[in-house]
Amino acid sequence: MSESQSEIEHNNNNSKLTKISQPPTVRIIPPLNFCPVEKQLYRSGQPSIINQSFLQDLNLKTILWLASEEPQEDFLDYCSMNNIAVEFVGLMNEYSYQNVNPWDALSEDTIKKALELICNKENYPLLVCCGMGRHRTGTVIGCLRRLQGWNLASVSEEYRRFTGSRGGRIMVELLIESFDINSVQIDPTKMPGWLT
């Protein structure tokens, strides 16, 4: 903040107070449903142009795209200009990279692939996202929490926190509960410190 944007005043206790006379020139706006998950691991809905200043400070190396549709072109351009690798995990299903419906749950193979990318510290800092940052992102983060040893009540509470007033999807919660965490192959030499 420049001196023209703020003035320093002294109060009765001789401590300094900063009075802001005009707003900052750069707006820092996080993506929809943004939240840190673990150190250098974040979740959100699809970032847009107004979120680029915020994302810049995260120094992202990888974005894990879980939506069943292609991301917006400006999002892909931003990733390309900033050397951010985008992993299109949500566009695949058991059959092919086509015919994936937005309302379909993620397959176990898709969740497994997403978790293996998350459990590799070489991909960090990493953002996990889908269109709104709710159900698909919530599924993967819920399965990650199970991998971390969280109890199901805590996993469900975190999932529901991001689904809003419409609530969660019971089928998603059942998928998180039944997911075979032992199917995830993790290289112990590449695990993030918070997973050990």
UniProtKB/Swiss-Prot annotation:
Organism: Debaryomyces hansenii (strain ATCC 36239 / CBS 767 / BCRC 21394 / JCM 1990 / NBRC 0083 / IGC 2968)
Entry's transmembrane regions: none
Pfam families to which the protein is assigned, alphabetical: Y_phosphatase2 (PF03162)
Enzyme active site: 130
Reactions performed catalytically: O-phospho-L-tyrosyl-[protein] + H2O = L-tyrosyl-[protein] + phosphate
The Tyrosine-protein phosphatase domain, residue ranges: 33-192
The protein's name in its UniProt record: Putative tyrosine-protein phosphatase OCA1
A single GO BP: cellular response to oxidative stress
Compartment(s): Cytoplasm
Function: Putative tyrosine-protein phosphatase required for protection against superoxide stress.
